[in-house]
Amino acid sequence: VIAANDSYEEGELYFNGAETSHYSETDWEKYREKNIAMIFQDFNIIENLTVLENVELALLRVEDKIKRRKTAEDLIAKVGLTAQKNRKGSKLSGGEKQRTVIARALAKDSPVILADEPTGNLDVKASKEVAALLKAVSKDKLVIVVTHNPEFFVEYATRRVTIFDGSVKEDKVIRKPLPKTSADKEEIKAGKWQNFKNTMHIGTLNYKSRPKFTAMM
């Protein structure tokens, strides 16, 4: 629902304090394009393209080819794949493929990154590396991880939400996000950011707080 890949019939999804239940299909498309970047379990990269070409696909809005290439290379460096940037997707390991997907998600420059089982197809070593990388990029993003492997993320998550049979069974703050302003501190102190029981409220405070990393299990 947060990714706008499915609709909802009960409750309300707020985004920056605004209701979304009245959104039309066009509204949802705009919302998704502007606000959401996805990381999938099955990598979802184009196997016959290089790492660089896969990341550049998310930068087609950048008309200047030189700037597009520089931005892509910077993002690839950020996820530690500079040495593999000219390697085709079919030649990458699982961990390298997921790093490519993370770089592509960052290229979209959306405020929210949704990671759907990002370690599901990875071994333990690669899973730990991807979890640490998602923590690193969460410093200026809201990262929501859906996972059946919480052990890889509990070290980094600021909030853990356990969902069973369509209901929230646990909503636990593991560690408080770090506020940037005194106003944020007052909101955190007042507990205004903790309500998740009946609605998913991705509010202004979520974007101001850093780091922001929610694991949903």
Question: Predicted segments — roles?
Answer:
Residues 11-19:
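Conserved ABC transporter NBD signature motif
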Residues 56-69, 78:
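ABC-type ATPase nucleotide-binding domains, specifically the catalytic core motifs of the NBD
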Residues 113-116:
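Catalytic Walker B motif of ABC-type/P-loop ATPase nucleotide-binding domains
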Residues 3:
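Helix-to-loop junction immediately C-terminal to a conserved catalytic motif
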Residues 81, 85, 105-106:
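ABC ATPase C-loop
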Residues 33, 87, 108, 139:
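Conserved signature/switch motifs of ABC ATPase nucleotide-binding domains
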Residues 20-37, 194, 201:
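ABC ATPase NBD coupling module
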Residues 88-92, 96-98:
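Conserved ABC ATPase signature
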